[in-house]
């Protein structure tokens, strides 16, 4: 019995030791736990960081603060993102990708005490411009290093090349990383075990070395400033699966004409925005494993290259922004094709019959080409289609019912064609963007569009859509852009159209037949940037709740029947750049304000065709800070920017150079003040001369008096000045002749007197610029100044100069000439015959004849 107890006791001790020995290594070393906690405390957790982060495969992973689970009471081996060696307990891997970390990454970080690390992933955090420490090169056992998209900046240290065991190196970022050009090749030379190399957006600014690791499966060098000819050896890396050289505009790529060593392995090839030498060779036909090909913006021309049609396993083909032409061939061989983009090739033509042969398509973009005819109505195999873009072609006919029946449709863009008929009910419940603008569609807005839960873009402008705007539109709580302008909609604007939507940025209901008051409540916290309601029959007052639109850049309520005084409070909208209240029934004086922060960013102010009275609003004019500067930082024209310019161009009526224009895009330099057709009185404030960026000034058809301010000479970029039909008196300031950009001038029907300035632009204006001013004189008017010939027109001055240069000879000169000629002539004859030198006379005669002939030719040239 005692022996049995002894055996059980020894077995118990053995098992206890066994369990203890197997669990002890999992206890994190205290110094490493402390190092991790110190590392954690160097950063804050930003809960406003992106909720999702893309990983290297393009998939999205959810962000969350992994370090919140770290505390002293538990072993660090159990902490989120920390992995320990099962035998020794040493920390060998740290995965903190997408962990919402924010703060400076110091070069002496406690992280570098974890000397046994084999895998380190710090991607998708925010280290706010920290430098990459050379100490990363001390992790001698590291096989995986990912620092991408974490806002590192500066030069990538050469010590990274010491990590000779690296299999994966990912340091791509758009924050401003670079590698010293002569360090790139040595870096590759030492990293002979690399499988994946991603340096996207890192500034390399060098030629492409040829000493890449022969084990490479992934090489991503997009946007790195590579130049020169790509070594052909890159295409012969036998294990290569993914090659991305996109956005290197100085890189030349010449594809091998013979079979590539990588032809069996290569699955993704991206060469967007590089220079492709020669045509696509037949060797492309051997890329049997290729699934994705991006050759956009590579200057391909002619028909779609035939070798591409042999890529039977292709799933994504992107040939956008090229110069391809001719019809699109049938696609029955592309059985696996899911994404096809031929966007903006311009000269691709023919019909869409080829669509009948593909059943796997999920995304099709044929926009901005020359495709013609109707969309085939007998297509039934595109049930997987999610995105269809056919905008900016020459397509016509009705939109076939199969498009409205697509069960998984997410985005539809058929804009800028001539489609007719009605918009049918949509079957899909997943729509996020519907763009049918600029067609000939009619009928009502279908209810199925107004019941979408994820709709962000609804652009139906420039059609013949009729009926009322249903209150069901208020169900679109995710809407960002709503453009129903230039249709035949009538009735009132639903009050809830803005109230229930916190994402709405653009609201355009312009050029319809909407009536009633603007009873919409613009709620606090809205993000509206554009409100365009012009060209309707809206009445009542300007809604005071507009004061809640803190991000508003454009407000166009023109061409309505609003009856109100000037809404001076709109000046508190600090982002407002364009304000049009033209053609309403606004009235009364524009009261001055002591607040110098009103309308400071305004670039276009149109209050024309109203009933405003009193003096011009000098205090507001003095606040227009955006007009007090001329931006000479760029020579290329820039338009007032908007994050949704690609989808939407606002339509605003502006008056410049004597004409009204419906402008869809407005130059950032276009500064306009239009206060015409009102009842303003008093003098023109000289403070307008401070608005040196002004391009158009129209104060016509008011009751203004006094003189034209001499300060207008400061308006050096002014292109159009209209002060007509007022009671302005005095002379035209001579200093205005210095306005070299002035193209249109209208000072007619005033009480101006004196001489019209001469020179430069003033010599190009006609009588109509000055008519109705009986006291004016000088060119181009027939009335001369001063009552004598002292003042003449430029043409008369030229004639006088010509007459001064002509050889006019008075009668006294004629007599003197004859007398002198007679004496000299007789003397010459006497000398000639007395000296017997006729040869000498002959030579002298020839010489004189030559001189006279030359001078006569010069004289003729002057005329």
Curated annotation (Swiss-Prot):
Membrane topology note: Single-pass type I membrane protein
Region listing for C-cap/acidic domain, in residue ranges: 760-812
Highest taxon of source: Eukaryota
Cytoplasmic side: 834-863
A single Gene Ontology CC term: plasma membrane
Intracellular or extracellular location(s): Cell membrane
Start and stop residues of the LRR repeats: 91-114, 115-138, 140-163, 164-190, 191-213, 214-237, 240-262, 264-286, 287-311, 312-336, 337-357, 358-382, 383-406, 408-428, 429-452, 454-476, 477-500, 502-524, 525-549, 551-572, 573-597, 599-623, 667-690, 691-714, 715-739, 741-759
Keywords: Cell membrane, Glycoprotein, Leucine-rich repeat, Membrane, Plant defense, Repeat, Signal, Transmembrane, Transmembrane helix
Region (N-cap) residue spans: 24-90
Function of the molecule: Involved in plant defense. Confers resistance to the fungal pathogen C.fulvum through recognition of the AVR9 elicitor protein.
Entry remark concerning the domains of this protein: The extracellular leucine-rich repeats are required for the specificity of the elicitor protein recognition.
Name of the protein in its database record: Receptor-like protein 9DC3
Native source organism of the sequence: Solanum pimpinellifolium (Currant tomato)
């Amino acid at each position: 019995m005692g022996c049995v107890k002894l055996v059980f006791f020894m077995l118990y001790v053995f098992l206890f030791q066994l369990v203890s020995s197997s669990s002890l290594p999992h206890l994190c070393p205290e110094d490493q736990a402390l190092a991790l906690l110190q590392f954690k405390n160097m950063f804050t957790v930003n809960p406003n960081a992106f909720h999702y982060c893309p990983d290297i495969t393009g998939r999205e992973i959810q962000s969350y603060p992994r370090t919140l689970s770290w505390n002293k009471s538990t072993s660090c081996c159990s902490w989120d993102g920390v992995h320990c060696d099962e035998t020794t307990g040493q920390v060998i891997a740290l995965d903190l990708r997408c962990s919402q970390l924010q703060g400076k990454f110091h070069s002496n970080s406690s992280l570098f005490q974890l000397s046994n690390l084999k895998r380190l992933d710090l991607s998708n955090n925010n280290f706010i411009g920290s430098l990459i420490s050379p100490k990363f090169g001390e992790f001698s056992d590291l096989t995986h290093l990912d620092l991408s998209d974490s806002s590192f900046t500066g030069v990538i240290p050469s010590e990274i090349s010491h990590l000779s065991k690296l299999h994966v190196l990912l340091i791509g970022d758009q924050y401003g990383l670079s590698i010293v050009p002569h360090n790139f090749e040595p870096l590759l030379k030492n990293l002979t075990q690399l499988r994946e190399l991603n340096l996207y957006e890192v500034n390399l600014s060098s030629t492409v070395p040829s000493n890449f690791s022969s084990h490479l499966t992934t090489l991503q060098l997009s946007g790195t400033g590579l130049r020169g000819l790509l070594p052909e050896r890159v295409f012969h890396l036998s294990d290569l699966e993914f090659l991305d050289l996109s956005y290197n505009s100085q890189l030349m790529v010449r594809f091998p004409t013979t079979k590539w060593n990588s032809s069996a392995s290569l699955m993704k090839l991206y060469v967007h925005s590089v220079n492709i030498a020669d045509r696509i060779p037949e060797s492309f036909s051997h890329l049997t494993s290729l699934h994705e090909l991006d050759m956009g913006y590579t200057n391909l021309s002619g028909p779609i290259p035939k070798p591409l049609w042999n890529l039977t396993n292709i799933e994504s083909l992107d040939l956008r922004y090229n110069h391809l032409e001719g019809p699109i061939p049938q696609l029955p061989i592309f059985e696996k094709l899911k994404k096809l983009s031929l966007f903006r090739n311009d000269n691709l033509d023919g019909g869409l019959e080829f669509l009948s042969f593909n059943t796997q398509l999920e995304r099709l973009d044929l926009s901005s080409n020359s495709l013609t005819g109707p969309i085939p109505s007998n297509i039934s195999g595109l049930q997987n289609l999610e995105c269809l873009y056919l905008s900016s072609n020459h397509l016509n006919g009705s939109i076939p019912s199969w498009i409205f029946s697509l069960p998984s449709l997410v985005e539809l863009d058929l804009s800028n064609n001539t489609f007719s008929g009605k918009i049918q009910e949509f079957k899909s419940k997943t729509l996020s963007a519907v763009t049918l603008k600029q067609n000939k569609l009619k009928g009502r807005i279908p209810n199925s569009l107004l019941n979408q839960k994820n709709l962000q873009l609804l652009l139906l402008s420039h059609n013949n859509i009729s009926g009322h705007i249903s209150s069901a539109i208020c169900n679109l709580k995710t809407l960002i852009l709503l453009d129903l302008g230039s249709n035949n909609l009538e009735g009132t604007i639903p009050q809830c159209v803005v109230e229930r939507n916190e994402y709405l940025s653009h609201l355009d209901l312009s050029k319809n037949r909407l009536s009633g008051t603007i009873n919409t409540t613009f709620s606090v916290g809205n993000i509206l940037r554009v409100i365009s309601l012009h060209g309707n029959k809206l009445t009542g007052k300007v809604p005071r709740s507009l004061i809640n639109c803190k991000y508003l850049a454009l407000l166009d309520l023109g061409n309505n029947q609003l009856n109100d005084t000037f809404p001076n409070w709109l000046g508190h909208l600090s982002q407002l750049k364009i304000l049009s209240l033209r053609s309403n029934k606004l009235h009364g004086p524009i009261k001055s304000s002591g607040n110098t922060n009103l309308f400071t960013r305004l670039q276009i102010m149109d209050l024309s065709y109203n009933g405003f009275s009193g003096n011009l609003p000098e205090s507001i004019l003095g606040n227009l800070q955006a007009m007090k500067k001329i931006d000479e930082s760029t020579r290329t024209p820039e338009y007032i920017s908007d994050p949704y310019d690609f989808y939407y161009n606002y339509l605003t009526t502006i008056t410049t150079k004597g004409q009204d224009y419906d402008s869809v895009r407005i130059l950032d330099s276009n500064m306009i003040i239009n206060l015409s057709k009102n009842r303003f009185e008093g003098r023109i404030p000289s403070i307008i001369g401070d608005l040196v960026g002004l391009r158009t000034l129209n104060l016509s058809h008011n009751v203004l008096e006094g003189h034209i301010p001499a300060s207008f000479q400061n308006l050096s970029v002014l292109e159009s000045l209209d002060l007509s039909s007022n009671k302005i008196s005095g002379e035209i300031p001579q200093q205005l002749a210095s306005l070299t950009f002035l193209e249109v001038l209208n000072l007619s029907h005033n009480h101006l007197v004196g001489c019209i300035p001469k020179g430069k632009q003033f010599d190009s204006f006609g009588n109509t610029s000055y008519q109705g001013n009986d006291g004016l004189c000088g060119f181009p008017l027939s009335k001369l100044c001063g009552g004598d010939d002292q003042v003449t027109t430029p043409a008369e001055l030229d004639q006088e100069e010509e007459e001064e240069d002509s050889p006019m000879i008075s009668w006294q000169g004629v007599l003197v000439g004859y007398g002198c000629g007679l004496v000299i002539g007789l003397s010459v004859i006497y000398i000639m015959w007395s000296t017997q030198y006729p040869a000498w006379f002959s030579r002298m005669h020839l010489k004189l004849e030559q001189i006279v002939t030359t001078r006569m030719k010069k004289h003729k040239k002057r005329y």
